[in-house]
Regions:
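Bacterial Sec-dependent N-terminal signal peptides
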Residues: 1-24
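Short, hydrophobic/aromatic-rich segments at coil-to-beta transitions
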Residues: 20-24, 59-61, 81-88, 105-109
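N-terminal secretory signal peptides
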Residues: 20-67
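Hydrophobic/aromatic beta-strand elements that line small-molecule binding cavities or substrate pockets
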Residues: 49-55, 75-77, 96-101, 123-127
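Contiguous, well-ordered beta-strand patches that form the walls/edges
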Residues: 63-98
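Edge beta-strand at a domain terminus
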Residues: 67-80, 114-130
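Short, exposed beta-strand-loop hairpins at the edges of beta-sheets
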Residues: 97-123
Length: 130
């Protein structure tokens, strides 16, 4: 039931949003790109991590709030598919990310690169959408 509600909310919010959408998350896991296997398969253990993502009604700004910081991301482009919504974003400090709302797996995913150029994927498990 929760997944159906989540799908309905994300579908509506990606096309005809009339209010901000909030997504609370319960855990976080980071995986690194393995050049040999060509997969994100070098992963940390999932850790308990309460955080919230808030997309404004125009879908041009995403805010991520944790217990110790708030980051703002400005949307530069977006694409919608049946089970995915993808945003290209730039953070308030100039870092570029690809953000995926993975409807089927109930995940928010941030893909970026570290200072050495290594690609990582941080996945947040969704607790609630409102």
């Amino acid at each position: 039931m929760k997944q159906l509600l989540f799908i309905a909310i994300l579908s509506v919010f990606s096309f005809i949003s009339s209010a901000q959408t909030s997504i609370s998350c319960k855990s976080r896991e980071t995986c690194w790109w393995n050049v040999d296997s060509e997969q994100f398969d070098i992963c940390s253990d999932a850790v308990f991590d309460n955080s919230m993502f808030v997309m404004n009604e125009n879908e041009d700004m995403l805010v991520h709030k944790t217990s110790d910081m708030t980051s703002t991301y400005y949307v530069t482009s977006s694409e919608s598919e049946e089970d995915y919504i993808t945003y290209e974003v730039v953070s308030d400090v100039g870092n570029e990310y690809t953000v995926f709302f993975d409807v089927q797996n109930m995940l928010v995913k941030f893909m970026g690169t570290d200072d050495e150029g290594d690609i990582y994927l941080t996945m947040y498990a969704i607790k609630s959408v409102f």
